[in-house]
């Protein structure tokens, strides 16, 4: 009897392992990145009059907002609709668009698409995002016209050829990957400076003016999220930081603007939240103590 109990236990363990492996196919990994930490729908999903994402039209573009530094922005359709989306793009072309900021016709993608950090998406994660985007329901959505205040950058640098997998067994390093390339927290929470759109000497120190998604035409200013500084979130508990990320509520109970994509972040894996917080705790900017 004990022998068969052990056999049953082994079979259960194998079944659990198989289930876990199945959830990490490229499409499943891509779904996770797009719909949680990547929060692609925060810009690429249209919203109703109350500012809520419209169900059934996910990633079809059409969300319009005023960016104080860039101009009138219109989120593009990234569903595989052939006429109005990216249905004619190959998965390799989607990866090039993500990491090199270049469309199949050779034109450059404008900000606020976070190309500067997407350049460091791992090969597997970039491919997973592309695979997922090709798998979603095509939605036809003819978009309005964007109007920019600033010219296109001349380029986003040399083409990306290879980015290795991030070290998931290193909690802090993986948290840095999630906060940077995967979740692009880095871009919203890093101010411009020195004639550059992002002053990396002030990374995560906040102060960047962003569109306020709760008040059209309004401005939201990103906060300092360095976790090793009393001027950032260093005096917040882990639970308070998690609540801000996943519910949009500060430590004092006030609400964050929906520019912060907590509606997507709330579906993030607990281990990924822990990794991001562990990374933020290591940030101790000079001159902030």
Which functions belong to the PLM regions below?
Residues 19-35, 50-51, 154-180:
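Electrostatic cytochrome c docking/interface patches
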Residues 193-197:
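Small-residue-rich helix-loop
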Residues 1-5:
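N-terminal secretory signal peptides that target proteins for export/translocation
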């Amino acid at each position: 009897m004990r022998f068969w109990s052990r056999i049953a236990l082994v079979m259960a363990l194998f079944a659990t392992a198989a289930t876990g492996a199945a959830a990490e196919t490229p499409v499943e990994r891509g779904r996770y990145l797009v719909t949680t930490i990547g929060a692609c729908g925060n810009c690429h999903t249209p919203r109703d009059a109350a500012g809520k994402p419209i169900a059934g039209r996910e990633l079809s573009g059409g969300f319009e907002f005023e960016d104080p530094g860039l101009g009138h922005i219109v989120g593009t359709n990234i569903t595989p609709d052939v006429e109005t989306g990216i249905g004619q793009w190959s998965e390799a072309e989607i990866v090039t668009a993500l990491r090199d900021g270049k469309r199949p016709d050779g034109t450059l993608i404008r900000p606020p698409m976070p190309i500067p950090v997407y350049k460091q998406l791992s090969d597997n994660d970039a491919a997973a995002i592309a695979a997922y985007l090709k798998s979603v329901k095509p939605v036809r959505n003819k978009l309005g016209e964007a109007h920019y205040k600033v010219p296109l950058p001349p380029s986003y640098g040399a083409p990306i050829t290879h980015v290795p997998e991030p070290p998931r067994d290193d909690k802090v390093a993986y948290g840095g990957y999630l906060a940077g390339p995967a979740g692009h927290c880095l871009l919203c929470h890093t101010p411009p400076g020195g004639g550059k759109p992002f002053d990396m000497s002030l990374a995560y120190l906040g102060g960047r003016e962003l569109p306020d998604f709760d008040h059209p035409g309004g401005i939201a200013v990103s906060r300092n999220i360095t976790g090793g500084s009393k001027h950032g979130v260093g005096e917040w508990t882990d639970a308070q930081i998690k609540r801000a990320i996943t519910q949009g509520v500060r430590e004092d109970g006030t609400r964050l603007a929906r520019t912060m994509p907590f509606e997507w972040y709330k579906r993030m894996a607990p281990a990924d939240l822990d990794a991001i917080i562990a990374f933020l705790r290591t940030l101790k900017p000079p001159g902030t103590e």
